[in-house]
């Protein structure tokens, strides 16, 4: 599995950042270009039925080498990197045999990965770790996943003594902007179940995600010359502030954890005449999720009642649901991943995803898809890192899962 590092370092050289603003599919041309390169690589290692469609979805097949019928399994990762920080000119560095101290990422800018801020890195003392130069994200989310899947497929091709059923491979665009499953053709993919490799640290096995919605709040004010504004002006900036303060101050990402939900204010655009607030709403529990959506609408209603006119409009749109609802119906998909980890000396860590993956939506599209670790930490930022051994073990895990299904 040693090839996984070389692959990963090659993939992150390609800028595949997705865009919140774009209406194209995929949202950036570089993703489509990268998809074509991956398609060529999949053909080169010997996969069959390789396709790259106009939307940037890559699919391929590793044919079964056994006679009996077993479930067709899929392995999926996404090609885009987060818009939160630049993915251009990524300049990675390998910290060999990490010594357990702070890591200076960029001496000139005094950017330091500090162990008191990111203590999880101490779990990898003595290992080789890939870090950034402090100017960009790393792209382990999710190019580590891509490298692991392709490395595992090549290993299975080169080791026919390892028995496996039919395996499908899929790479998606635009996961980071919530569109990864928009044009995913589940029927064409042809798997009975799948796994995304889009998780964090080694051992993570995730079969629960948030229920997710987004809310856009439009506030219509009225501007009047401030010298004669009494009883006439409606300042949308102040109304926006009122709206923000009417939601629970402690139910925000920075004050919640585990199974706790939140309202997250993403952006504010405001002036006297008009204001716009953009929120995301998250909760694991479906009932609480529905209550949160009603709660944010109710804030708008109360403000409208106070002003005795419709100055606030709240539009809520569901994004994805907790995949646990669907995965519980085929629990063996989690059990096999759990057993596979144990078989290769990894302690499984069953944790809820405080976020979403392509698997969230795919599970509701008829393809149950829990999430496996890809190995990285601190995604979407300059402090992102990935231990080399974690990537190697993720590739080994893919092989072992395929083997266990063949032996069911």
From Swiss-Prot:
It is found in: Cytoplasm. It catalyses: Release of the N-terminal residue from a tripeptide. One of its GO terms (molecular function) is zinc ion binding. It holds the Pfam family Peptidase_M20. Gene3D superfamilies: 3.30.70.360, Zn peptidases. The keyword Signal does not apply. Its EC number is 3.4.11.4. The active site is at 80, 175 (proton acceptor). Zn(2+) 2 binds at residues 141, 176, 380. Coiled coil: none annotated. The keyword Metal-binding applies. InterPro entries: ArgE/DapE_CS, Bact_exopeptidase_dim_dom, Peptidase_M20, Peptidase_M20_dimer, Peptidase_M20B. Its cofactor is Zn(2+). It comes from the Bacteria. Binds 2 Zn(2+) ions per subunit. Its main location: cytoplasm. GO terms for biological process: peptide catabolic process; proteolysis. Belongs to the peptidase M20B family. Cleaves the N-terminal amino acid of tripeptides. NCBIfam families: peptidase-T, PRK05469.1, PRK13381.1. HAMAP family: Aminopeptidase_M20. This is Peptidase T. It comes from Clostridium botulinum (strain Hall / ATCC 3502 / NCTC 13319 / Type A).
